[in-house]
């Protein structure tokens, strides 16, 4: 006989981890789970601030879509630009911050910041209870799942919330946009106008 716990585990999948997100994954694909949304509303209703980290090299329309979705759930969203000396971004840290301030920074309740070191330490310093991650496709999930579990291990008080952008942005990434720009393609439908101009200057 299957007990209540077994039924709940099978509903959420992956050892219950996905009860903290707005969807579950089954062989048939992604779909919204009303019960997981209920858990979200109950457990995160007191959270006022969330961190949306990334390299944003550069910011795309997909990023902005996730930011706007996150803003509907939290009083403040801190868009945190990672400073990583091991990477060689196309845009400098200052340029990425400026582009974000010109785009995402115009959304009410959104603040732009930079960080280095452990994400959970930055979240703690900002008194943020959640980290926002965008999922474009199932292929993103394995890496994000591992990172979310590691962050939970480092600080169980910081939860990870997965948000999916509009379908039209599921294929979009900064890497693809930069490649199109380098090849002389039109990126105006993928990024804000100021970013398209900046890419044109960088890649000309």
Short names for language-model regions:
Residues 2-46:
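Intrinsic disorder/low-complexity segments
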